[in-house]
Amino acid sequence: KALPRTEDQAAILFAEEVRKKEMQKQKVKRLALSAGISAFLLVASVVIFAYTVGFDFVKDSYFGYSTKELLEKEWITSEYGEPAIIISSPKVLKRTIDEKIQNNLPENVKSTSRFAYGNITDDFSIVLITTAYKDTTKIDLDLALEADLKELEKFGAKNIIVKTGEFENVKGLSGKKAYGTFTAFDPDSEEDIKMQYDIMVLSQPGGAQEFFFMYREEDEYAKQIIEKIQNSIELRKAKK
């Protein structure tokens, strides 16, 4: 049978319980303070990095622009490739080089260049390909569209639904287009997502230009961006 506790023993046990609870509180406070400091340092690091390299660079590289922001921001007019094509766009397209393509050009091709913004599963992306021929070759636009749809598959598109039609912008430039939907695997969500695309092919003696626009399904801002880019297109004559 347990002996009854004395008042001194009870006081000691009570004091021990109080001490344990106080230690637990201090531990929680230290953890919270540590987490707060870590979060502050992370935010501070991002801000300093963004200030150093530019907020546009950080947003572009890590967060991306919404199509509404792209549509409403100040646009840039640039010249790309050969034969040169001039377009206005919300962001400058960056040249990409595929050594395999460059080292295996068809006999009649003088040069080809590729420029891009974004990736296939981004809210909005563009690929522009320019090709210069050694002679006054004018490509078959229907065959070019078929090749471009195969190129879309290389980008990662699956279940491609295709519609075709004519293209003409406000400046009178005309060509062929293919448009529709596809699915692509999104590494962020680890799921297939449904996208829309517009492909345009323009041709002139000695050269051709091909556009790929890819965007989230039913994104009205993306459609307005595409229309605005299309209407800005100007072509330079192919160099002889």
Question: What are these regions, as identified by a protein language model?
Answer:
Residues 4-116, 120, 161, 167, ...:
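N-terminal targeting sequences that direct proteins away from the cytosol to non-cytosolic compartments
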Residues 90, 142-149, 198-199, 223-230:
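Extracytoplasmic/secreted envelope proteins and their assembly/folding machinery
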Residues 100-112, 146-200:
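Signature of long, low-cysteine stretches enriched in small and polar/charged residues
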Residues 112-146:
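A short acidic-to-branched-hydrophobic micro-motif
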Residues 123-124, 173-175, 203-210:
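Coil-to-beta-strand transition motifs
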Residues 132-135, 182-186, 205, 217:
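Beta-strand elements of well-folded, non-transmembrane domains
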Residues 137-141, 189-192, 222:
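Solvent-exposed, non-transmembrane alpha-helical starts
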